[in-house]
Amino acid sequence: MATKEELLSLGLSDSKVAETLKNVKLTETIGSIVKLASESGEISKQKGTLLYQLATKLKPQVAAHTPLVVKYIMNDGIKTEPQLSAAIEYLLSHTVKGIQVPDFEKSCGVGVVVTIDDIEAAVTKVIGQHREKIVAERYSFPAGKLLGELRALLPWADGAITKKEVDLRFLELLGPKTAEDLAPKKKEKKPEGPKPSKDAAAAATAPGTKNQKEASPEEFADGAETMDELLRTRAHFHKVGENFKQDGYVTTPKTAELLKAHVAAVGGKVVTRFPPEPNGVLHIGHAKAININFGYAKAMGGVCNLRFDDTNPEKEEEKFFSAIEDIVHWLGYDPARVTHSSDNFQQLYLWAVKLIQKGLAFVCHQKVEEMRGFEVQLSPWRERPIEENIQLFEDMKNGKFDEGEATLRLKLTLEEGKVDPVAYRIKYVPHHRTGNQWCIYPTYDYTHCLCDSIENITHSLCTKEFQSRRSSYYWLCNALDIYCPVQWEYGRLNVNYTVVSKRKILKLITTKTVNDWDDPRLFTLTALRRRGIPSEAINRFVAKLGLTMSQMVIDPHVLDATVRDYLNIHAPRTMAVLEGLKLTIENFSELNLPSSVDVPDFPSDPTDPRKHSVSVDREIFIEKSDYKPDDSDKSFRRLTPKQAVGLKHIGLVLRFVKEVKDAEGHVTEVVVKAEKLSEKDKPKAFIHWVAKPVSCEVRLYDRLFKSKNPEDAQLVPGGFLSDINPDSLTVVYNALIDQSIAKSKVYDRFQFERIGFFCVDRDSTSSTLVFNRTVMLKDGGASGKN
């Protein structure tokens, strides 16, 4: 541990010393470095700065070479920060291959002397290349661009001296800064939001945080329009075979040999995997996982496997296997291979025996309650003889223990403090693929990393909650002397006003709150597809969120906005009436109108030739809300006894003649007179309508829950089932659609003019179509207009 005096001897300020002393690990590293350096002589301020930088940049993989770097700093072989960075990079790149001193010296410029004359000449050359632009832009010219070019020319030059020379040349060329130079530059106004998140590489090593942040559309600045763009430009992961360069990666004497075989096996290409549990359908959070795993492999020219983590036979059903694979294809991805953790049960068992033989695993008889938590007593069976553990594990395999009577545990402590995680447990449940062959099943923590190794996964990409298991991931692979992939983490995606827990969704189904896993009010991917949300919109939504370590909580309207943007371009427009009111045009025969008119499918794009034919008739239907029997509401802009209204697409203006009422006094029909639209007397509004319509059923979906977080015990003390929105579904049984869409197929999508975007549901029959509302229009649709 470095003392205050030792830190001061490095030339640090009092405030920097105080800050450093708070970091115990860094202080310990500095202490050992100062001790090594002191053996070589007095520490000057320049050397002290380099020694401090060494302590902050040093990674565990190269810690053994600390004496070598200290030696070169103290004998003036390494004099600048660029040299130090190059030295550390060389050591990191040669963690596995080993270092050669001549190569090391060459890589970090040992013995290279950069004189003032060299710096002046390089600055003259670089400024000369940009002179015209510098003169034009004056001090607004980005000096960083010049410094970058100078670093390329003179990588070992002192950065401070180089910067001083550039500043001097600017002064000579441009003279002192004028008032205009000093005036603050106007910046383009950007929407306020949080600072862009760090890229995934930085995120993987960032300290953990339990904070979730709510995201809004303005926070898409760190994302991209497509997953390909996002993963090419933001995902700075390791190169295939350079696993050892990553923080926390543990190397062994066999690492070089294993990595060489691994690179050969994958042909130098990226291999990822998406490993869902087949005990439920996928939800919106899985869309992010699918896109990152499949998307990264695709962007890098590699492949991605779909691996079912089928290690818990109690909860797995065949329907979930097919549903998951179907959704992966729906999102636009094709797995290179479909694999199962159960494919490897025999190998996993043999490795468990090997761990026991190495004294790294033991059979334990503690109950779950005794093992649960962080401050637990070590198992009294932790140090039982290896031979006894082997026999007991064999007895577990052969069905000689009851469920819960014995487990196999690993001898390690996780980052979060949990001790000796369980590797195998007993379950007398037939497995859907292996039948009754096994009664012991491996846990996720044991299976996950080993299956990654078997499949030669290059990048094990997972959500942040697995960060605390990274050490056990590396420990297991290295304990068995097998190839060890690199685990990277990213922030999980959650959505407000819903639940995604499989257990809670099942509760919603069993209580008949929702109909099934694909009920359009849920945020499972099958439900979103059924609601009419396109896979392309989901992929774009995920891409726009970017790569971040933060756990994001998204409001549903953020997804809706992305969906709306997509459908506005891809969903053809049509007219439909939800609650119809019959209008009879009394002078229809005088108008000499055609029996039908052509209406563009995409009127916002005049170059798009697609169109559909709409019937024209004496009797038409409009929305009840588009007519008011009195004129008291001055803000109302549509049909009243004293106010005309226009019909979209047909160039007619309707004027009130009379109402027709039933015996109870309800208006059942309005008789109107029509006239051709003219420039003189334009109505205040134009409304949609249908003629000779077809009846259908329309389902209007809203949020399933009233609260943002229905799982919050403080906000919803009665539990999530007490928070159900009673108006989450409204069914319109006699809606009217135009004949042009009467033959639509399941999943066909349309924009019902002035109402919203709708999709044909699978409940449709040959006689009655059923439409689900996908999203409303931005303005709330016809009901929100005056």
Curated annotation (Swiss-Prot):
Q: Identify the residues that bind L-glutamine.
A: D309, Y444
The domain of life is: Eukaryota
Which keywords label this protein?
A: Aminoacyl-tRNA synthetase, ATP-binding, Ligase, Nucleotide-binding, Protein biosynthesis
Query: Which parts of the sequence bind ATP?
Result: 277-279, 283-289, 463, 492-493, 500-502
Enzyme's top EC category:
ligase
Q: Does the keyword Nucleotide-binding apply?
A: yes
Q: Which CDD domains match?
A: GlnRS_core
The record ties this protein, via InterPro entries, to: aa-tRNA-synth_I_CS (IPR001412), Gln-tRNA-synth (IPR004514), Gln-tRNA-synth_Ib_RNA-bd_2 (IPR007638), Gln-tRNA-synth_Ib_RNA-bd_N (IPR007639), Gln-tRNA-synth_Ib_RNA-bd_N_1 (IPR042558), Gln-tRNA-synth_Ib_RNA-bd_N_2 (IPR042559), Gln/Glu-tRNA_Ligase (IPR050132), Glu/Gln-tRNA-synth (IPR000924)
* GO MF terms, alphabetically ordered: ATP binding; glutamine-tRNA ligase activity
Position of motif 'HIGH' region?
276-286
Question: From the record, which residues define motif 'KMSKS' region?
Answer: 499-503
What does the entry list under GO cellular component?
Answer: aminoacyl-tRNA synthetase multienzyme complex; cytosol
UniProt record, GO biological process = glutaminyl-tRNA aminoacylation
Q: Which residues form a coiled coil?
A: none
Residue stretches spanning the membrane: none
Q: Which stretches does the entry tag as region Disordered?
A: 181-218
Bias kind Basic and acidic residues: ranges: 181-198
Name by which UniProt lists this protein: Probable glutamine--tRNA ligase
Q: Which gene encodes it?
A: qars-1
